């Protein structure tokens, strides 16, 4: 797994949380 991928997943999850 690439670090970039992990960061992208974390950012995506954070965005969803903020949106909700």
Swiss-Prot record:
One of its GO terms (biological process) is response to antibiotic. It holds the Pfam family Tet_res_leader. Keywords: Antibiotic resistance, Leader peptide, Plasmid. NCBIfam families: Tet_leader_L (NF033685). This is Tetracycline resistance leader peptide. It comes from Geobacillus stearothermophilus (Bacillus stearothermophilus).
